[in-house]
Amino acid sequence: MTKKRKNLINQDPHYKRELEKYGNPIPSREFILTVIRDNNAPMNRDEILTALSIRNEDQIEAMRRRLRAMENDGQLVFTKRKRYALPEKLDLFKGTVIGHREGFGFLQVDGKKDDLFIPNHQMQRVMHGDFVLAQPAGLDRRGRREVRIVRVLESRKKQIVGRFFLENGFGYVVPDDSRIGRDILVPNEHRNGARMGQVVVVELQERSASFNQPIGVITEILGDNMAKGMEVEIALRNHDILHKFPSAVEKYVKKFTEEVSEEAKKGRVDLRNLPLVTIDGEDARDFDDAVYCEKHGKGWKLWVAIADVSYYVRLRSTLDVEAHNRGNSVYFPNRVVPMLPEILSNGLCSLNPQVDRLCMVCEMQISAKGKLTDYRFYEAVMNSHARLTYTKVAKMLEGDEELRTRYSTLVPHLEELYKLYQALLSARHQRGAIDFETIETKFIFNAMGRIERIEPVVRNDAXKIIEECMXLANIAAANFMEKHKEPALYRIHATPSEEKLTSFRTFLSEFGLTLEGGLKPTTKDYAALLEKVKERPDHELIQTMLLRSLSQAVYHADNIGHFGLALEEYAHFTSPIRRYPDLTLHRGIKYLLAKEQGAKRKTTDTGGYHYSFDEMDLLGNHCSMTERRADDATREVADWLKCEYMQDHVGGEFSGVISSVTGFGLFVRLDDLFIDGLVHISTLENDYYQFDAAKQRLIGENSGMQYRLGDKVRIKVEAVHLENKMVDFSLIGSERKPRRAGKTAKEKAKKVFKELPSKASKKRKSAVKKKDVSKKTSRKRK
């Protein structure tokens, strides 16, 4: 190696990483991109090799493979002139295709706020979920930024769930996911015993260049109809959620015993005599956190013990790869798909009562005013003194004599825990954290697996105590990593965008409300608004709209703070059994603890690891994706179950609130049931209706009739579309009568039409007038 070559390699900021992976390293992808960017023009392969002083045959071959891989991943574009160019220099985008049931689609591009529109004819070249390279194609007639597909970089959708049909001797599968806009052709030799109408899984075959007709092989027959549990099986496959542990993982976990070995307990702080207890819901099966609190001076000392999952799940082991790919456990209404095998999630890693367990401990000191004044982390062994439930603890705090007698030794500690909670709650309000009181629901199933009733979930003080204790441990963990400049996955929550802020303020103005803070409202401003409206009958609606105005919390290597919690740093530490980000944080903390004791290695004997920032950056994107994937899948199942429930109520009348207003109708959320349905614009009164997006309302052009977000209404259930997971309603009355025709109403309507975009006049032509609507009116949905 020449001196010039050595010096150039040393300029690569990722050289050490490459050296750890390869004995004879080549420049990193990042450095190759920098070289091409600095050249200010596309480069052929020889020019790149010369610029990087690469002459060794093995390294030339390695570079050829790396450049091809970078091309496949969309980092580089190989032009017709056989040169490598940067996509952004060619004005190209990399992104994920999101299909729409109407046949068009959108391109989600990392780092871009708005999605790009993919017209129907371009969607014929791709499929929902594809990772593609696309080129801007101007604006469509509605002013949306349109793209043209250049190349499919990765076909991510390998398997599709749907119903199998036969027609004129041809077999095909109609996808259950409406975002997949085309049927899948199944040749006779690939039906594998599937019969007409069965729910099947079809595996897509290699696509042709034109991709005119997707072809597949039936690999699994799920059943003849929607049997019990079928909705979960479909959602798992629709969202590509891993739900069966590979044989290699099953083999790997066989080495674990039911009890913690004495060898594993060595060198740990012994907390077995400390009366730590778990407090969870009645139906909880895995217990990954335990708490104990005692008075300390004028304040308190709090121990939060978390299952030491990282001791068993070692980095890059077969088990770790599977946990990483899953990202998190998925909680369906009637089934759990765990991140870890049961021997760990319900066994060795679960802090079950009266058994020794390994744990990571965050021991904290809190002032009388609820401020975290000191903390320390360490590895320990514990023995849970009791498995308590939220209901039991709440009753004990309320004075239940029978329970207080049964758990007499624990009651004093629980009372201190409650006093601590009150101080933490006061400190939370003092810093201005947004305190949402969202209504969650629980499905009660009958023996057939169908919903018998839907109940709201009540969060008592015991549940809130644990939430505050966990949040404090998360704060301490994030602070520990930030203080030591150790790469970590932070739970970040960005400030609201200007667009969403403006929209929310317009909504508030309709209710005579304001959000203080000018262009940059603080968390305290939002909290003050919620406090102001909490006694109003429409407070749930206002809170929902406030939630929509905020950004989504995600995992990220860059710590920008958590807006909603009003915190400078926050991370997830307390649930490593069910969340991979927590597992990575445990590894980082263990590494720092070992480093403080003089250790020099990146790994520790108990499962610690020093991640690089780049590794964390990739993990942040991945874990945020798996979290969204789980949310989408559970929402899909809940929607299906709600529709199934509503099938027994077609023709029934219910009260509800308008929860969303669109150009094609109103969505109404039913009181008590919390089920949403659509009142299509074609079913409204005999008038032309215009959508006022700014003020979230539909306005009758002639009558002045208005339907507004938050209006209380009475509806009739008209139809249930189980295949689309949608319910149709019709309006039969409104508790707050909409403003009807009259001089004032008409003038207001005219004023609104003048304020609407000019293209509104074009829409008016297609607005639906009841007397002109036949039974064949298509029900346009978004």
UniProtKB/Swiss-Prot annotation:
One of its GO terms (cellular component) is cytosol. GO terms for biological process: mRNA catabolic process. Residues 744-757 have a biased composition (Basic and acidic residues). InterPro entries: CSD, CSD2, NA-bd_OB-fold, RNase_B_OB_dom, RNase_II/R, RNase_II/R_CS, RNase_II/RNase_R, RNase_R. The keyword Signal does not apply. SUPFAM superfamilies: Nucleic acid-binding proteins. Keywords: Cytoplasm, Exonuclease, Hydrolase, Nuclease, RNA-binding. Residues 651-732 form the S1 motif domain. The keyword Cytoplasm applies. Residues 268-594 form the RNB domain. It catalyses: Exonucleolytic cleavage in the 3'- to 5'-direction to yield nucleoside 5'-phosphates. Its EC number is 3.1.13.1. Residues 736-782 are annotated as: Disordered. Pfam families: CSD2 (PF17876), HTH_12 (PF08461), OB_RNB (PF08206), RNB (PF00773), S1 (PF00575). It is found in: Cytoplasm. GO terms for molecular function: exoribonuclease II activity; RNA binding. 3'-5' exoribonuclease that releases 5'-nucleoside monophosphates and is involved in maturation of structured RNAs. HAMAP family: RNase_R. NCBIfam families: 3_prime_RNase (TIGR00358), PRK11642.1 (NF008648), RNase_R (TIGR02063). Belongs to the RNR ribonuclease family. RNase R subfamily. This is Ribonuclease R. It comes from Haemophilus influenzae (strain ATCC 51907 / DSM 11121 / KW20 / Rd).
